[in-house]
Amino acid sequence: MIERPSTDSGQATEVACLADPVPAHPLLDGLTEIGRGESSIVLASRDDKHVFKVVSSPADYFYLAADDRPTGIHFPHLFADHGIVGKASNGYSFRLLEIERLLPLAGEAAELGRMLVNAYWEGCEKWANMGVNRGRLALYHIAQDPPAGLPASLVKAVAALSDFIEEYPVQPDLLNPGNLMMRGDGTLVLSDPVFLP
């Protein structure tokens, strides 16, 4: 059974981080690492608006860079795909993406994030007998019957994410801390909501 993350205590569930070093690339020389996840490394760019994200998971690459990826106000903006920059220890290629800089959730975005995570968790519990497909069903049902108070733009984003997941060999992950972030203006962003099963 999956463990429900604490959304109120401020304590994040521990996430295994990619152990690989930052790959050598001229665009990354001298940049500061600001984040690391299960399959990615984030480095600050020379301005406050962009970051460089080195991804080793095809799921992350599809989500952030595919031509038919979901787009809109609740999805990260891709500025450039700089291609393959090495090979990760997991066997996949490292790809270098330049995306918008996002921030940890706070204020109203944090409240919307909690609402979305709670609805997703409830759906996962409801559809637990569906095994690995429970997350897909939970997402689909949020789009079809959203919780009260979820803005129409976020419902539309959840529907777009649900459609994307049906087309790619990925599963949704809204429970992992850091998969929901926000822009400086407070807009909730589905920053990294997919993984390879």
Give short role names for the model-derived ranges.
Residues 1-31, 145-152:
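Juxta-kinase regulatory segment immediately upstream of eukaryotic protein kinase catalytic domains
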Residues 28-92:
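ATP-binding glycine-rich loop module of kinase domains
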Residues 44, 98-101, 182:
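Conserved hydrophobic "DFG−1" position in protein kinase catalytic cores
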Residues 50, 74-77, 95-97, 169, ...:
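Protein kinase-like catalytic core scaffold
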Residues 51-58, 100-102, 192-194:
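Active-site ExK catalytic segment of metal-dependent nucleases
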Residues 76-154:
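Conserved structural core of kinase catalytic domains
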Residues 152-165:
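Acidic, glycine-rich flexible loop segments
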Residues 164-197:
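Catalytic activation segment of kinase domains across protein kinase-like and atypical kinase folds
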